[in-house]
UniProtKB/Swiss-Prot annotation:
<feature type="region of interest" description="Binding to RBR1">
    <location>
        <begin position="143"/>
        <end position="153"/>
    </location>
</feature>
<feature type="compositionally biased region" description="Acidic residues">
    <location>
        <begin position="352"/>
        <end position="362"/>
    </location>
</feature>
<feature type="short sequence motif" description="RCR-2">
    <location>
        <begin position="57"/>
        <end position="59"/>
    </location>
</feature>
<feature type="active site" description="For DNA cleavage activity">
    <location>
        <position position="103"/>
    </location>
</feature>
<keyword id="KW-0808">Transferase</keyword>
<keyword id="KW-0945">Host-virus interaction</keyword>
<dbReference type="InterPro" id="IPR001191">
    <property type="entry name" value="Gemini_AL1_REP"/>
</dbReference>
<keyword id="KW-0190">Covalent protein-DNA linkage</keyword>
<keyword id="KW-0235">DNA replication</keyword>
<protein>
    <recommendedName>
        <fullName>Replication-associated protein</fullName>
        <ecNumber>2.7.7.-</ecNumber>
        <ecNumber>3.1.21.-</ecNumber>
    </recommendedName>
</protein>
<dbReference type="GO" id="GO:0016888">
    <property type="term" value="F:endodeoxyribonuclease activity, producing 5'-phosphomonoesters"/>
</dbReference>
<feature type="binding site">
    <location>
        <begin position="221"/>
        <end position="228"/>
    </location>
    <ligand>
        <name>ATP</name>
    </ligand>
</feature>
<dbReference type="InterPro" id="IPR022692">
    <property type="entry name" value="Gemini_AL1_REP_central"/>
</dbReference>
<keyword id="KW-0378">Hydrolase</keyword>
<feature type="domain" description="CRESS-DNA virus Rep endonuclease">
    <location>
        <begin position="8"/>
        <end position="116"/>
    </location>
</feature>
<dbReference type="GO" id="GO:0016779">
    <property type="term" value="F:nucleotidyltransferase activity"/>
</dbReference>
<dbReference type="Pfam" id="PF08283">
    <property type="entry name" value="Gemini_AL1_M"/>
</dbReference>
Length: 362
């Protein structure tokens, strides 16, 4: 007579199913975590499901630090804390812990402990498994969560293609640019020179009404004359202050105009592209990937007097004589001798009782 085959499973990852188990996820996790094993437990995930007839059952994934040889069919039995009842599981070695984890997560009623140990194997295998991983990553809705999914489900790509994944997910999950809302009513600026008003009327327009080659403008004046807040109150724009960042996180190709504020002209990259409202040019600023700029919009250059800020003084340098001749054909130059406002004004709303000083914003 053949002896019955003895029970033995030797695996790092165990998949347990408890049919007709009334324990909560918390009770099951606590009991499993307290089991004494020769090799340390690294991760436990418990999923509670209901059959169509309403009977509950539990699925569990347990990951060990090394292979754990189980010879006792009752080792993973759970006990009811309120009545004399034992719950015996079906015990299997999990060939792919990633597949088991995905299976447990399909209904969402789960509880976990520890840190999941990434497993490169998948019982599904092939291209379909890779497509599933990337589809799941895209459905997360954020870059950080997408990277976590790929780290778990596509570890080879995560290690070998991390740079590309990081860059591509930056583009895919780029948040919409925050729309700037001017804190001042247009009526606050009651001393705007006529030549500035005319420049705005002719050049700051949407794409349909904008001139094919709009003219840019350089506005030079002392601090606290309202240059910045006035320039930013004219419509949708890109605001570049101190240095250039043309990444999609900051720069919009749908803006009506650019504002370049307090950038030393000696170090202004793409001087002609901005001032000449050039179209379809590429930026390869340091430490960033090339960015395609739609262009065709005017730029307001804001500066203070002085050799390290004034565009006029920069263009008056002998070495820049050719650039100056070009600039005079592509931009207007205005010097402010007084503020663009006459005093104190109501703030963003007419009902505001607090007096607001535009110069405090510039």
């Amino acid at each position: 007579m053949t002896r019955p085959k003895s029970f033995r499973i030797n695996a790092k990852n165990y998949f347990l199913t408890y049919p007709k188990c009334s324990l909560t996820k918390e009770e099951a996790l606590s009991q499993l975590n307290n089991l004494e094993t020769p090799t340390s437990k690294k991760y436990i995930k418990v999923c509670r499901e209901l059959h169509e007839n309403g009977e509950p059952h539990l699925h569990v994934l347990i990951q060990f630090e090394g292979k754990f040889q189980c010879k006792n069919q009752r080792f993973f039995d759970l006990v009811s804390p309120t009545r004399s009842a034992h719950f015996h599981p079906n015990i299997q070695g999990a060939k792919s812990s990633s597949d088991v984890k995905s299976y447990l997560e399909k209904d969402g009623d789960t509880l976990e402990w520890g840190e999941f140990q990434i497993d490169g194997r998948s019982a599904r295998g092939g291209q379909q498994s890779a497509n599933d991983a990337y589809a799941q990553a895209l459905n997360t809705g954020s870059k950080s969560e997408a990277l976590n999914v790929l780290r778990e489900l596509a570890p080879k790509d995560y290690v070998l293609q991390f740079h590309n994944l990081n860059s591509n997910l930056d583009r895919i999950f780029t948040p919409p640019l925050e729309v700037y809302v001017s804190p001042f009513l247009s009526s606050s600026f009651d001393r705007v020179p006529e030549e500035l008003e005319e420049w705005v009327a002719e050049n700051v327009k949407d794409a349909a009404a904008r001139p094919l080659r709009p003219i840019s403008i350089v506005i030079e004046g002392e601090s606290r004359t309202g240059k910045t807040v006035w320039a930013r109150s004219l419509g949708p724009h890109n605001y570049l202050c101190g240095h250039l960042d043309l990444s999609p996180k900051v720069y919009s190709n749908d803006a009506w105009y650019n504002v370049i504020d307090d950038v030393d002209p000696h170090y202004l990259k793409h001087f002609k592209e901005f001032m000449g409202a050039q179209r379809d040019w590429q930026s390869n600023t340091k430490y960033g990937k090339p960015v395609q700029i739609k262009g065709g919009i005017p730029t307001i250059f804001l500066c203070n007097p002085g050799p390290n800020s004034s565009y006029k003084e920069y263009l008056d340098e002998e070495k820049n004589s050719a650039l100056k001749a070009w600039a005079l054909k592509n931009a207007e130059f205005i010097t402010l001798n007084e503020p663009l406002y006459s005093g104190t004004y109501q703030g963003p709303t007419q009902n505001s009782e607090e007096e607001v000083h535009p110069e405090e914003e510039n």
